[in-house]
Amino acid sequence: MTIPYLLLDDARAGRARLYRDHIRRDTLAAADLDQLDALLARGWAEGLHAALRIPYEFGLALMELAESAPPLVLDWYARLDQLHGDAIDAWLRDQHDGAPAGLLDLRFDTDRAAYARTIAAIHELIRAGNTYQINYTLRATAASYGNPIALYQRLRALQPAPYAALAWHPADGHTLCLSPELFLARDGDHLHTLPMKGTARATGDIEAAKAALARDPKNRAENTMIVDLLRNDLSKIARPHGVSVSDAFHVARHGEVLQMTSRVNARLRPGITHAAILRAAYPCGSITGAPKRITMQYIAALEGSPRDLYTGALGYIEPEEMRLNVAIRTLQITDGHARFGVGSGITIDSDADDEYRECQLKAAFLRHPPDIGLIETLRVENGEPQQLDAHLARLAASAAALGLPCDAEAVRTEVIARCATAAQPHRLKITLPRDGTPHIELAPLDAIARDVLVCEHGEALPDRDPLRRHKSTHRTHLDRIWQTAVAAGAFDALLYNQSGYLLEGARSSVFLQIDGAWHTPPLALDILLGIARARLLAEPALIGTTHITESRLSRADVARATRICLANSLRGILTARRIARP
């Protein structure tokens, strides 16, 4: 979907608000926040529906801690649908084709040693008496493959969240938010917040683990600090004696994590505007620490990159009603690049190793792969699997990237045992499913001619698809392409991307001789790291040259090539002649 939309999704209760028919986007700098209510009144008078998107750094400018910061965003939609139960899943399913979607190579920007050094620095700041708790956060990056809406639907099932959101806007890319935390809820003159502080792993006897977390002195102390901060924030806009705390130290499960919350309530003074509420409370104290202002200064110095929407807020706003989440557990995906933030509250009692593990735990739900596996296909000669080391190395690397378990040495042992009696050439196929249990198939391999035909596939593939770098079980479309080519008398079909560059064959790597020099497409085009390709680059003499250049090659380059070679591990190096499309 490439039209702006917003789904505010209570996946636990099975209800959602779907905003569509985007009309316009208003933005407000922090210095202009008092104009918010006038903007709201104008949009509501037009019969439109308002949604808020507030980056964390807006709060820095609001507190005059930054000269410039990204603005508050107010999106206006003409249509609002209330969805319930299966209708939410049905709408999500309608937005994608069911192909696998996930993340590859999820990496944190801070290793354990660097993290420990920062925690030591935070402890020094706390000892100096200027802060009691600092919410220190890390960034993770990954390559995203498949439809982000399909990824959201899968993550939503893994970790149903009460304050989730899914959105797309050309200025933002895709936002996939699985937040368990409420920032602000307004109903008339009643306002409440549910700050989340206190974390434990959801394992073993869950009820016992919940009770243990609720009793834990360190987590209760963290929670109490933030509750006191938010009581102070809300007292700025509440009636005298109008702030109270209820449901203190409540523990709930969110996927693999247990989280502690306490509820802070406020009765608003007459005439309090939406702008005044945000000015008093934003950003949520649970993601800053205490005291808020100086701790935000420390955060700006300690963290290596902006948080952006992460730890900001997403939600809706109506004349007498407002719901804003704390935008944690939030993926932002732009052009296949995914960003994710995760952090924890650091106090004087915090242990760096424990806190780092907590960050890993909070991100664990991202590492669950979809229903996808890996394939390796290799040639067996005289009972010997050819280039087995290279295939196992690729299998292990791809498994790590996709988050699949893989015992490469166990696979090696099974492969060697299966091949021992294969005197004639055989085809060996290794399939590694999501659970990491390998499946080995061995079949006789018929000989083919060394001179073959190759055709061109007419449909362009996406420019960016990092899953193409891995030989996954999601390859029915590729099998269909080469099988169509075979039916037309060819060995394979050449694939091109939407920019017109040659990628590879549906089952082979491609090498072209142009003006006497040999070329092959670069891995940067998201092509398979072919075993035969790597061997030819290392041993170019195999095709009678001293060097092969990785180049972006167009259809015109293919047309003027004087020689074409196709290569894969099963068939080796083949000389090809180009024919028309099948």
Predicted features and spans:
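Extended alpha-helical targeting/anchoring segments
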Residues: 1-382, 493-497
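Helix-start/capping segments and mature chain N-termini
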Residues: 223-226, 256, 260, 326, ...
